[in-house]
């Protein structure tokens, strides 16, 4: 009987503790000042895909003035669709605007 009472009291206390805990809401902070560029280029990513994407994006946007190419961050994805036997890669790059 003593153990049953102790169990019931601990359950009630646990219930009160769990009710007093506030839910933590995840806050989505929008990344202000971040621009995203996507491009499709010939070839596969390989081991240095990020570097190849940065170079390809710099060549592609060579003529645009004021472009901050120093902070360019890229990801490389191999395109699963091969057209006419030529592999392609997709580069998604982000830059501070």
Swiss-Prot record:
UniProt xrefs under InterPro entries: SCRL (IPR010682)
A Gene Ontology term for the protein's cellular component: extracellular region
Subcellular location: Secreted
UniProt signal peptide: 1-26
Disulfide bridge map: 35-97, 45-76, 53-91, 74-93
Gene Ontology biological process terms, A to Z: defense response to fungus; killing of cells of another organism; signal transduction
Main location: secreted
Protein name: Putative defensin-like protein 227
UniProt source species: Arabidopsis thaliana
């Amino acid at each position: 009987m003593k153990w049953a009472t102790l169990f019931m009291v601990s359950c009630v206390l646990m219930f009160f503790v769990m009710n007093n805990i506030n839910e933590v809401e995840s806050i989505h902070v929008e990344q202000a000042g971040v621009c995203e560029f996507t491009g499709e280029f010939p070839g596969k990513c390989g081991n240095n895909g990020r570097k190849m994407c940065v170079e390809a994006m710099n060549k592609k946007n060579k003529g645009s003035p004021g472009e901050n190419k120093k902070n360019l961050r890229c990801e490389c994805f191999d395109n699963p669709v091969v057209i006419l036997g030529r592999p392609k890669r997709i580069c998604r790059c982000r830059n501070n605007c």
